[in-house]
Amino acid sequence: MSIANGETAKDAQVVIVGGGPVGMGLAIELGQRNIRCIVVERRAHPQPIPKGQNLTQRTMEHFHFWGVEQAVRAARTIPREYGIGGLTAYGTLLGDYSYDWLQRELVRPFYFTDNERLPQYAMEAALRRRVAELASVQTLYGWSAEDVSQDDHGAQVAIRQLDGDERRTVRADYAVGCDGSRSTARERGGITQTLSDHDRSMVLLVFRSQDLHRLLERYPGKSYYNVLHPDLEGYWKFFGRVDLGSTWFFHAPVPPGTTKDN
């Protein structure tokens, strides 16, 4: 390789900081175009938390063209014949008033694919498998981006191995920040955020209950349930199915000072 004007050899054309759904989606998009890229992701495995479960038709269109749609649908944890829509109840989940919420099937004629629902960790696993099929994509799992900088020749990302002492610098034409709201790439790029503090904390619990499944048979074909109440001051209590019959998640506000021990 010929390097001119003091330019240092590059490891890839693009370094992607963050290997969640956004980072992996970008890696697939670039990899399918034979653009060499490196994904730096701090977690060796997806977090086993059933968040981000609703996938819109537009998201599934992307998955289709990335060659991962069928793998994502196969990872669904609720039977195909059971509904994946939701409802909102007022006051209490067992009250007299509720209405259907996010009826995505109503806009199905405007899209190429159906929507889907599954835990984010299952979806991320499918994306990781697809990335592994692309020769132009290198993944560095278990590595954290410590710094991002640039010069006249491109971008540099200083990374650190989380389960060891190794450090290195990855060089590319471009660095892309896909590392969430506390993005190192965003901060180093001087991109600011406008934030507003609030005094409410939320808890996300995962639990098992077959009794709750039987209790909610009054809402056939529903997979997630919101409860609105004046005392919550605009926040909500949010139940959802992880599978059909036993496993659930619960998202709700908790008093200030709440910890995992109390």
Q: Language-model segments: what does each one mean?
A:
Residues 1-11:
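A short, basic/flexible loop-to-alpha-helix module at the beginning of a structural domain
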Residues 6-8, 103-114, 248-257:
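Short glycine/proline-rich turn/loop motifs
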Residues 9-39:
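N-terminal Rossmann-like FAD-binding beta1-loop-alpha1 element of flavoenzymes
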Residues 10-12, 164-174:
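Core beta-strand elements of the Rossmann-like FAD/NAD(P) dinucleotide-binding domain
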Residues 48-130, 229-232, 240-241:
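Active-site-adjacent segment of FAD-dependent monooxygenases/related oxidoreductases
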Residues 129, 174, 178-262:
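Conserved FAD-binding catalytic core of PHBH/FMO-like flavoproteins
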Residues 141-156:
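A conserved short coil-to-beta-strand element within the FAD-binding core of flavoproteins
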